[in-house]
Structures are given as C-alpha cells and as structure tokens.
Design a protein with these regions (language model features):
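Primarily a LysM-type cell-wall glycan-binding module
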Residues: 3-34
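Gly/Pro-biased beta-strand-loop elements
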Residues: 65-168, 192, 220-284
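Structured segments of extracytoplasmic/periplasmic soluble domains
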Residues: 32-36, 43-46, 62, 87, ...
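Loop/turn positions that initiate beta-strands
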Residues: 23, 54-59, 197-203
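Flexible, glycine-rich surface segments
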Residues: 155-206
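Short acidic, glycine/serine/threonine-rich helix-capping segments at coil-helix boundaries
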Residues: 18, 42-55
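Short, charged beta-turn/beta-strand-edge "cap" motif at the junction between a beta-strand
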Residues: 25, 64-68, 120, 205-209
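N-terminal targeting pre-sequences for secretion and organelle import
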Residues: 191-233
C-alpha cells in the first residue's frame, strides 16, 4: 500500500529502510520519519547508542501498522503500541507516535471525548504533581518551558489531555504524568483535524493481528528496557504474551484458522519487533 493514510485492509503504511549519516541520532531519525526512537530500537537487531548510532548503518523504519481491534471512528489511543489513530473518515486515517504515563501515573483506559481545544495552553500543575516536585510554580505560562507544548486537546476525563511537548524525546516512552504527548508537529496536525465532541477510545493492545491482500499478519510490542523508567512495574513479560497472541490471532483468523503457522506466531512474540509479520503456512 503506497498511501500511508488510506485504509483498504487491516494494515496501513509501508516499512522503509534508512542509512544513517554521521550527524544522525536515533531521536532525529525517528522524528523525521514520524515514529519514536523506541520503534527503531524494537524493529532493528541493533545495540547502539541512541545519541551516536554511527554512520552507514542500515535501519528498518517501521511505518507499517496493523489497526487495533475496535470500532474505527474518532480517535483510538493504543497504549499497547504507543500510537494514536485518528479516523478522518471510513477510508482514511492519520496515526502518530505518543508518550504516555509512567508507572504510578498510568494513562486511564476507556471512552472519553474532546471537550476543549486550546492553542498555547497554560499549565496548572495538579497538587499531586506539585507534591512530587515542590519547585514547580502554581502556573506555567505558554512558551518553551511549558510541558504541554503549543496545542492541547482537553478530554472529558478530568485532568487528562492530548498535547504537544517541549521534550520531544519523551515520545515513545512511558514518562508522563498520565497525559498523552505528541511531537509538536503532530499535535498541530491533529489539532486542526479534530473538533470538540470527537470520541476518544483509550485501549491497551500490545498485540494486534489483521489481514492485507489475503495475508494474515501479527504485530507484537514490548518496549525496549532503554526507554523504560526503572520504577516501571506494569510491563507485560513476553511469556505472558503467548496466550494473548493465540487469542488475538484466533479472533483475526476466524474461519481461516487452519492457515495459521503457529510457529511463526511464537517467533513473532519472542522477537516483539513491533512490525507486522506474516504468519501463514506456506502455500496457504
């Protein structure tokens, strides 16, 4: 599929390759391709410094994604793959990498809606946040020191927002106080697309499965240790992903369950590369 925003199957986008330059960082490469550097770490069999990856390294840029299960309308925020999906209509979609709440400040699951849009928002740190960091002022004016960035979408869940950030490297990580952060350029796009009243569904699907061109795929996500806070206790172990993978694949395959190569499913879980992997038996 050549058009990243067109929906004709359960998958959108196409993976590409990139060869690093001397001045590159994984953070800059990720942002230039609208993914997170955690996506790059997961998708590639590399052990490199995100700040100095070196030159002439060929990297897979994971731009292909299986759409989450669920009604395809409004905004779906999947904390399982750290991505936000906005369904503009039944045929087109925008999707962006996100950062979410860390351990103890988990982003809540469930339905909400956008109740307010604000350019250059002022941040009023909640008392719970100020207890953690007493040096914070009661009000943070709009500007480069404001962690909300230059756009904010306020949710019907009290104190939770979809917003930009003044620390783009936090996109793709679980480091916030529960809000959903996007790259500055992505929140500007989303801000212009959506209106007040748009439905938001926050889900947790670290494993997704779906069809493209009569081929069945699985996509398994497990965050690299590098991007996790040491206090994170809510990370699902890979051993716990196997039964979930079987359940998800069975749901996606339906009556075509006999075409599934379960060894490929097991391997996909073990690798957890965060990219769609075809899981059909040969000649099926």
């Amino acid at each position: 599929m050549s058009n990243d925003n067109n929906i004709s199957n359960d998958l959108v986008g196409v993976n590409i390759f990139y060869t690093t330059n001397k001045e590159d960082t994984l953070i800059s490469i990720a942002r230039n391709h609208d993914i997170s550097f955690a996506d790059i770490l997961s998708a590639n069999d590399v052990n490199m410094d995100p700040w100095i990856p070196g030159e002439n390294k060929k990297l897979l840029i994971p731009k292909s994604h299986i759409l989450p299960f669920g009604k395809r309308e409004g905004i779906i925020i999947n904390i399982g793959d750290l991505r936000l999906y906005y369904f503009k209509d039944e045929n087109s979609i925008e999707n962006y990498p996100i950062g979410i709440g860390r351990s103890g400040w988990e982003t809540p699951l469930g339905y909400a809606k956008i109740i307010k849009k604000k350019k250059d928002p002022v941040w009023i740190p909640p008392e719970s946040v100020r207890k953690e960091d007493p040096s914070l002022p009661k009000v943070v004016a709009a500007g480069e020191d404001n962690p909300l960035g230059n756009r904010a979408l306020y949710l019907s869940i009290p104190s939770y927002l979809i917003h930009g950030t003044n620390k783009p490297y936090g996109v793709g990580m679980k480091v916030s106080h529960g809000c959903i952060r996007l790259y500055p350029e992505d929140i500007e796009k989303l801000f212009n697309y959506v209106s007040e009243g748009v439905r938001v569904n926050i889900i947790n699907q670290p494993i997704k499965a779906g069809w493209r061109n009569k081929k069945l795929y699985i996509e398994v996500h497990s965050l690299p240790e590098y991007v996790l806070e040491k206090s994170n206790k809510d990370i699902i172990k890979k051993s716990e992903l196997y039964p979930l993978a079987y359940e998800i694949v069975q749901k996606a395959a339906g009556v075509n369950i006999t075409v599934v190569d379960w060894n490929k499913v097991k391997e996909a879980v073990a690798l957890s590369k965060g990219i769609p992997i075809e899981i059909m038996l040969v000649n099926k």
